């Protein structure tokens, strides 16, 4: 009986000792719907960043955990973008710029995801719709915070359409 008590006590101590506190500096992006982003654009012009994901995508989960949970990333997105999380396999209709997009059973994906990526589906994909509502700019693949920084700052600082990306890339100094 004594050894059972010690075993239980040791188990509880182990559980509390191994329990992790949230990592310091971790924050989350405050995601909104596409409709909310569109309404917000009427009040204040900002680019829209869309995280295009699927439920089964492992790299999408890694990007959520490592990139979008990064304090500097989330703070910058909160300040400069309207951030939208969009399931590419979602079945709800989406209205955008006077057009309605629906789930496409032939491709087993949403027509809006096909539109955003120009038909080049890959997950995760970060899509940025610049302020002037030009074509969506799709950046496929997992992006670590240091790689993500240059891309979002190119759009967030208003350089898209003014300066070629390769010129911005040469002048860019990372601060994350």
Name each model feature, range by range:
Residues 1-24:
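Bacterial Sec-dependent N-terminal signal peptides
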Residues 18-29, 42, 130, 136-176:
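Non-globular targeting/processing and membrane-anchoring segments
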Residues 29-48, 77:
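A short beta-strand-turn-helix
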Residues 44-58, 83:
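Short active-site neighborhood of thiol/selenol oxidoreductases, capturing the structured segment around
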Residues 60, 70:
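Ligand/cofactor pocket segment of small-molecule handling proteins
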Residues 61-65:
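Detector for the c-type heme attachment site
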Residues 71-74, 78-140, 145, 150-157:
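Thioredoxin-like thiol-disulfide oxidoreductase module
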